[in-house]
Design a protein with these regions (language model features):
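Short, solvent-exposed beta-alpha or beta-beta edge segments that form flexible loop/patches at the rim
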Residues: 47-62, 140-142
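Surface-exposed ligand/attachment interfaces on beta-rich extracellular proteins
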Residues: 53, 57-59, 95-97, 199-202
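Polar/acidic, low-complexity leader/linker segments enriched in S/T/G and N/D
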Residues: 1-43, 199-203
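Oligomerization/assembly interface segments of phage tail-like spikes and tubes
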Residues: 59-83, 147-161
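Mixed-charge, glycine-accented linear interaction segment located at domain edges/termini
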Residues: 131-203
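Short helix-loop boundary/capping segments
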Residues: 100-136, 141
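Beta-strand elements of well-folded, non-transmembrane domains
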Residues: 75-79, 115-119, 132-135, 158-162
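Charged, amphipathic alpha-helical segments
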Residues: 78-102
Length: 203
């Protein structure tokens, strides 16, 4: 099994939107988009398989594809209400509001960010269509005389989706090149439905 890794240096503006509906072979609709926080690092790992068909002692055909996608997102900080929304925690009360970390699976979300394109000097915006986040570990440390930065890191696992475009093919993310960071952020806002404050559909 082959593994493809990607580490991003020069990135930011992580946005998230809850998956409202997904119709296999047609479209996916997002709702309640928001900016997750300030990003430090993003990484993903795409697991691919390759099967060779032999005949007459030679390779006659090769079939390859992506089996799964996973990654991490390190943030400088994240507000508790946004973390609860991302992970699907329930809540009660108002002042103070109590968030209950339950054993339920986190909701499916679409999410994206921009990264610096060193080759062109511009930016590439990436949108992952359908994924689930988890917080598998956390470290809390007392204050000391020296400054020690401790950033929260979230794990995620993505799934392949089948939409009307590209027809008959599975896709897990889109990437678009832009000349400016502002243009990349504007595209991410549209994907997450942040600009109009409502839902957005991709087909």
């Amino acid at each position: 099994m082959a593994t493809g890794n990607s580490n991003v240096f020069g990135m930011g503006y992580p946005v998230v939107a809850l998956v409202d509906t997904y119709t296999d072979g047609a479209s996916i609709t997002y709702d309640d988009g928001f900016v997750l926080g300030t990003a430090v690092e993003a990484a993903y790992n795409a697991e691919s398989s390759m099967a060779e068909d032999y005949g007459d002692d030679e390779v006659q055909d090769i079939d390859s594809g992506t089996n799964g996608i996973s990654g991490t997102l390190e943030l400088n900080m994240i507000a508790l209400d946004k973390l609860a929304n991302l992970l699907g925690w329930s809540s009660s009360g108002s002042t103070p509001k109590v968030y209950h970390v339950t054993d339920e699976a986190s909701p499916y979300v679409g999410f994206g960010y921009y990264k610096k394109d060193v080759a062109s000097g511009g930016y590439v915006a990436r949108w992952i269509y359908r994924a689930q986040f988890s917080r598998t570990s956390e470290t809390s440390r007392t204050k000391t005389q020296s400054v020690e930065w401790n950033h929260p890191t979230l794990d995620w696992r993505g799934t392949i989706v089948h939409l009307s475009t590209p027809a008959g093919k599975g896709v897990w993310n889109d990437e678009v090149a832009f000349e400016t960071r502002e243009a990349a952020k504007a595209w991410l806002n549209i994907k997450a439905g942040i600009s109009g404050g409502g839902s957005t559909t991709v087909s």
